[in-house]
C-alpha cells in the first residue's frame, strides 16, 4: 500500500513547527479526509477553517517572536563587541 503522506512525514512536520504545525495538519486532514472521517458538510468546513486559521496565527506570532529575539541577540552582540 503506497501512501501519499506517511506518518513519519507528518510527525517530522509537527516536531519542526510545533503547535502551529499540529493545527495546520489537523485542519488539512479534516478538510481533505472529511468523507473518510464521516463529518457532515458544515462541520468539516468550520472545524477545518478554524484549525487552519488558528495554526496560521500561531505561526505568525511565533515568527515575530523569533525575529524579536534574533534582533535582541544581535544588538547585545554589537554592544559587547564595542567594549
From Swiss-Prot:
Keywords: Host-virus interaction. Belongs to the microviridae C protein family. Plays a central role in the packaging of viral DNA into phage procapsid, which occurs in the late stage of infection. Can interact with the replicative complex after the completion of one round of DNA synthesis. When protein ORF5 is bound to the replicative form, the complex becomes accessible to procapsid and serves as a DNA packaging apparatus. This is Protein ORF5. The lineage of its organism: Viruses, Monodnaviria, Sangervirae, Phixviricota, Malgrandaviricetes.
Amino acid at each position: 500500500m503506497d501512501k501519499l503522506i506517511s506518518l513519519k512525514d507528518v510527525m517530522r512536520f509537527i516536531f519542526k513547527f510545533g503547535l502551529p504545525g499540529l493545527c495546520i495538519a489537523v485542519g488539512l486532514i479534516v478538510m481533505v479526509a472529511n468523507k473518510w472521517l464521516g463529518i457532515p458538510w458544515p462541520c468539516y468546513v468550520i472545524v477545518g477553517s478554524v484549525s487552519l486559521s488558528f495554526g496560521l496565527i500561531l505561526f505568525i506570532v511565533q515568527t515575530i517572536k523569533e525575529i524579536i529575539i534574533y534582533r535582541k541577540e544581535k544588538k547585545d552582540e554589537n554592544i559587547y563587541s564595542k567594549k
